[in-house]
C-alpha cells in the first residue's frame, strides 16, 4: 500500500494475538459490564465452550488521536451455547472484526468401527476440545456441504503433542461411511444470540454463524467492510455454524465498503 508523507499508520507487531483482555473457557453465567478498553495487543473478549454470556457496556475506543483500539477481533465466541447477549456497547478502530461468533470444524482422516481420527484445520484451534461426550456431531460432505450423517460422541482425546489431531469415539458405529476430508461439526453447541443497541464503526466485519436464533436490532453500524456477514467459513478458517434463523431489524447502516449485509451458505 502507498501512504502519503505525514500520514499516521498503525504497525501491528502482535500477529499471534495472544494478549487478550478477557479469555474465558469452560465457564457459565458470565457477565461483563461497564468496561472500557483504550488499547490492546490482541482480542477484547475470547470465550470458548462457555454458556450464558452477557456483555453490557463494553467500550473499545482508542484515546483521542490514536488510530487503533485492539489489534484483533473485539469479540470472539467459539462453540459457546445457551444465550449470548451483547448490548449497549461502542466498538471502533479494531484491526479485525468487531464480533465473530462461530463453532469449529474438524476434518475427518480415517475411521474404524466406533472410532475416527480427525484433525483441526488451523493451528490456532489447538489445545481445546470443541465438543463433549454426549454431543451429536454432524458429518458434512466438503464439496456440497450436505449433511451426510450424525454420530453421538462418547470420548475425545488428542493423539499428538501439538494437540491438533484427535481420536473420536462414538456411542454407536456410524451407519454411513466416514470419508477422509469430511467436515465434522458440533451444531447444537451454539448460542442464541442477541446483539442490541450498540454503536460499532471503523471495523472490518461482524461475522455471525450458528444454528441458534440470532437477533440483530437497534444498532448503528457504519464505516466498515460489511456490517453483518452471515455464513460459516468452511473453506479457510474452518469456522462452522450455518445460519438457521437470523432476524435483522431496526438498525441504522452507514457507509460500508462491501455491503451492509451479506448472507450465504459458506465463505
Map each language-model feature to its residues.
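Short "repeat-start/strand-capping" segments in structured domains, especially the N-termini
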Residues: 27-31, 49-54, 80-85, 191-194, ...
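Ser/Thr/Gly-rich low-complexity blocks that favor extended beta-strand/coil architectures
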Residues: 126-161
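Long amphipathic alpha-helical scaffold regions
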Residues: 50-84, 111-126, 220-256
